[in-house]
A protein has these predicted regions:
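Hydrophobic alpha-helical connector segments
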Residues: 58, 72-101, 151-158
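Short helix-capping/turn signature of helix-turn-helix
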Residues: 49, 108-113
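Short, solvent-exposed amphipathic helices
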Residues: 91, 102, 116-127
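All-alpha amphipathic helical-bundle segments outside canonical DNA-binding/catalytic cores
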Residues: 83-86, 119-124, 141-159, 189, ...
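Short, hydrophobic secondary-structure boundary micro-motifs
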Residues: 104-106, 148, 178
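C-terminal peripheral helix-coil segments that are non-catalytic and often amphipathic
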Residues: 91-94, 98, 126, 130, ...
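Short, basic, alpha-helical segments at the C-terminal edge of helix-turn-helix-like DNA-binding modules
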Residues: 61-68
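Helix-turn-helix
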Residues: 12, 16, 20-54, 58
C-alpha cells in the first residue's frame, strides 16, 4: 500500500544518509548527495524530512533508542550486574557491527563541538547512561564492582570504550577483507574476538 511504499522510501533515504554522513562527516554532507545515493528526488526527501539536521537527528534517535530498549530489557532480566553489563556491552557491539555507518556517525556526534542535539536525543543519551550507571551501582551493592569507582564516569567510559573498540575491530575486518579474506568470516571472527574481550573486561577490570 501507500504507507508501506512511503516507509520504504523513508528507509531508503535514511540508509543513504547513514552511508554519506559516515563517509563524509555531517558538515560535508549535503541533501543533494543523500538523494543522489538514495535514488530519489529532492522533493521526495523534503516530503519526509525538513532538513539535513532532521535526517541526522532521526538516525541517531532511532539508533540510540534501539540500544536503550535493549539495555532496559537486559537490565530487567539479568540475575547479576556483571551478567547485565556483559550482555549490554555485547549487544551494543553487535549493533555497531551490524551498522558500522551508524557507529561512525554516533562516535563523531557524541563528541562533536557545537553539536545541536534535539531534546529527544539528549533524553536518550541520559537514559542510556542512567541504565548503565544503575547496573554499575548494582554491581557495587553486590560486591562485584569496587565501591570507590565513580559510577557516572564509568558509564560514560564504557560507552566510549565499546564504541571506539568496536569500530577498530570493524576496520581490521575491512582491511582483512580488502586483502582477500572472506568478508563474512572476517567480520564474524572480529565480532567473536571482541565478545570474548568484553566478557573478560567486565569480569576483571573492576576486581
Amino acid at each position: 500500500g501507500r504507507t508501506s511504499k512511503a516507509d520504504a522510501t523513508r528507509r531508503q533515504l535514511l540508509d543513504a544518509a547513514i552511508e554519506v554522513i559516515s563517509e563524509r562527516g555531517y558538515a560535508d554532507t549535503t541533501v543533494e548527495r543523500i538523494v543522489e545515493v538514495a535514488g530519489v528526488s529532492k522533493g521526495v526527501a523534503y516530503y519526509h524530512f525538513s532538513s539535513k539536521a532532521d535526517i541526522a537527528t532521526y538516525i541517531l534517535v532511532e539508533g540510540i533508542g534501539e540500544i536503550v530498549d535493549d539495555f532496559v530489557a537486559i537490565a530487567g532480566k539479568a540475575p547479576s550486574a556483571v551478567e547485565a553489563l556483559t550482555a549490554m556491552m555485547d549487544s551494543f557491539a553487535a549493533t555497531i557491527f551490524r551498522n558500522a555507518g551508524f557507529g561512525r556517525i554516533l562516535v563523531s556526534e557524541l563528541w562533536r563541538r557545537g553539536r545541536e542535539w534535539s531534546e529527544p536525543m539528549r533524553a536518550l543519551e541520559e537514559r542510556l547512561l542512567a541504565v548503565l550507571r544503575g547496573q554499575i551501582e548494582r554491581g557495587q551493592r553486590e560486591g562485584s564492582i569496587r565501591g570507590d569507582i565513580d559510577a557516572a564516569f564509568e558509564a560514560v567510559a564504557v560507552v566510549g570504550m565499546v564504541l571506539t573498540t568496536t569500530l577498530h575491530y570493524i576496520r581490521e575486518a575491512e582491511q582483512r577483507a580488502e586483502e582477500g579474506c572472506d568478508c563474512a568470516e572476517a567480520f564474524a571472527a572480529a565480532e567473536r574476538s571482541l565478545t570474548v574481550r568484553i566478557c573478560d573486561y567486565v569480569h576483571h577490570a573492576n576486581a
